[in-house]
Amino acid sequence: MAVSTVFSTSSLMLALSRHSLLSPLLSVTSFRRFYRGDSPTDSQKDMIEIPLPPWQERTDESIETKRARLLYESRKRGMLENCILLSLFAKEHLQHMTEKQLNLYDRLINEPSNDWDIYYWATEAKPAPEIFENEVMALLRDFAKNKNKEQRLRAPDLEYLFEKPR
């Protein structure tokens, strides 16, 4: 009986010492990515901001190259919600966009550092910054409403790229 008491007491002390050693580290270290221009408030001084290079418009690529790049970037987002939303949007609208609209779409999907921002703006959960309030954002918001009640469970297959125009 005395041996089991010693082991349970020492186990408890070890667990408490681990907790007291790790809990300050866990409570201080947290990561958050900020939208460009945001900075941590006084209460967020312990957060780490990961600086990203500023977005720059690519002026040296052809329209077809830009369309292909934007199609790829619309499909490979890193979060499923935007992969589905943006890839289906790209399938429906990318081929018909003007050069100006392609540039606006490029800025929209590549300038924000947080993909959730794009999703919240498209679904109107949060207001978009003034710089992104344009005709492409209006198209994306309208598309996100899914007025035709289409089933959107995955990104589209790429066969449509090889179909001949009708």
Swiss-Prot record:
Gene3D superfamilies: Flavinator of succinate dehydrogenase. It is found in: Mitochondrion matrix. It holds the Pfam family Sdh5. InterPro entries: SDH, SDH_sf, SDHAF2. Plays an essential role in the assembly of succinate dehydrogenase (SDH), an enzyme complex (also referred to as respiratory complex II) that is a component of both the tricarboxylic acid (TCA) cycle and the mitochondrial electron transport chain, and which couples the oxidation of succinate to fumarate with the reduction of ubiquinone (coenzyme Q) to ubiquinol. Required for flavinylation (covalent attachment of FAD) of the flavoprotein subunit SDHA of the SDH catalytic dimer. Belongs to the SDHAF2 family. It is linked to Pheochromocytoma/paraganglioma syndrome 2: A form of pheochromocytoma/paraganglioma syndrome, a tumor predisposition syndrome characterized by the development of neuroendocrine tumors, usually in adulthood. Pheochromocytomas are catecholamine-producing tumors that arise from chromaffin cells in the adrenal medulla. Paragangliomas develop from sympathetic paraganglia in the thorax, abdomen, and pelvis, as well as from parasympathetic paraganglia in the head and neck. PPGL2 inheritance is autosomal dominant. This is Succinate dehydrogenase assembly factor 2, mitochondrial.
